[in-house]
Regions:
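Short beta-strand element of the alpha/beta-hydrolase
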Residues: 72-82
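The serine-hydrolase catalytic nucleophile loop
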Residues: 84-96, 110
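Conserved alpha/beta-hydrolase
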Residues: 97-117
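Alpha/beta-hydrolase active-site loop
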Residues: 123-144
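Alpha/beta-hydrolase-fold enzymes
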Residues: 164-251
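Short beta-strand/loop motif that positions the catalytic acidic residue
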Residues: 289, 295-297
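Catalytic histidine-centered segment of alpha/beta-hydrolase-like enzymes
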Residues: 327-338
């Protein structure tokens, strides 16, 4: 299977070339009051829904987790990811667990997805999504129980790349961690393991440009449809990492109805979503990084090379790469197999947010 075909399961590329319009039933949702997470609620932290705006005027909705019996000002961590997920999935679990360990944490839905605002729905942008992290810092820094000089961020999967990019742009971020990271601009432009060259990339750009005409003609964006495969259709020919994504997003293990990655019907990403990712690489100034860094990846993760390459390129000597023995990419989503090194994340943030 070519890297570009493999990417389609995650990026919607298999639907991208189609001229059929997929109608989207999506619209922004109001904040849900009940607990509807893919993980159990902790009795050690207080939880509430919050909202704030990013620099582009998009309203971001998040879950704020505060340790019970907190005294004085605390350090804070903003968490988001994976790419196409919602705060009720992996990022919320990380946030709640770190709050149990003494931090005030915020898990948020990126612009245009989940409960956050923005039209059209299910759109991503390397620039806007990078700013979503800085907007989270804006919000946290206004809270009376948070020391604004002790704010860090953590990005999971594709949001690992955005987290590093945000730390490069925003010196207010005092520590940055990634878990099972992707560089979404790299994989959309070059496919897995950089196997897509200029000619194939140009053909993709032509299809994306044609899709813009179709969207204009139809007065609305077309959508890719389901991002991850139906678990019932997985067989011996299915790439292992594709099956692992389905096992998380499309089963009770991690399913959430507002998640782009969990959808099984007409939505998915906008078909033109890759345009800016292909043309605007993140981490261009990686060598100038001055923020302390922790990068965590699974030993057996198909995505491991993103973490290792990012680690090599980042200039700060205060950096650490942790390879989790035996872990695949999605093992670091929900700790199903007890692979998430929470002790390491706690140690890192306590050492650098002081």
């Amino acid at each position: 299977m070519s890297a570009l075909v493999a990417s389609s399961f995650i990026l919607g590329g298999n639907a991208m070339a189609s001229t059929n319009v997929v109608k989207s039933p999506l619209e922004a949702v109001s904040m849900v009051s009940e607990w509807d997470k893919a993980f159990s609620k902790s009795d050690k932290v207080d939880h509430k829904k919050v909202k704030f705006k990013n620099r582009y005027g998009v309203e971001i909705v998040g879950d704020l987790y505060t340790p019970k019996n907190l005294h004085g000002k605390a350090a804070a961590i903003a968490v988001s990811g994976p790419f196409g997920a919602v705060k009720e999935q992996s990022s919320g679990l990380y946030a709640q667990t770190l709050a149990e360990r003494g931090f005030i944490t915020l898990a948020f839905d990126p612009s245009y997805t989940g409960e956050s605002g923005g039209e059209p729905r299910n759109l991503a942008s390397p620039e806007i999504n990078t700013d979503d992290f800085s907007a989270a810092v804006d919000f946290l820094g206004t809270k009376s129980n948070i020391d604004r000089d002790k704010i860090g961020i953590l990005g999971v999967c594709g949001w690992g790349g955005f987290a590093l990019n945000a730390a490069l742009a925003d010196p207010r971020i005092k520590a940055v961690a990634t878990s099972t990271m992707y560089d979404m601009t790299r994989v959309m432009a070059k496919g897995y393991n950089d196997s897509v060259g200029a000619d194939e990339r140009y053909e993709t750009k032509k299809k994306l440009a044609e899709q813009r005409w179709l969207d204009l003609q139809n007065g609305k964006p077309a959508y890719t449809g389901a991002i991850n495969v139906d678990p019932k259709k997985i067989d011996a020919s299915t790439p292992q990492f594709v099956a692992q994504y389905a096992d998380y997003y499309r089963t009770p293990r991690g399913y959430h109805k507002r998640s782009v990655n969990s959808n099984s019907g007409e939505s998915g990403w906008t078909k033109t979503n890759p345009i800016s990712f292909i043309n605007m690489p993140i981490l261009a100034y990686a060598s100038e990084m001055r923020t302390p860094i922790l990068i965590v990846a699974g030993e057996k993760a198909h995505s491991r090379y993103f973490s290792e390459d990012a680690f090599k390129s980042l200039g700060n000597k205060n950096k650490e790469l942790v390879i989790v023995p035996g872990a695949v990419h999605t093992d670091l989503y929900d700790n199903k197999n007890n692979k998430i090194p929470y002790d390491k994340f706690e140690e890192f943030f306590k050492a650098n947010l002081k």
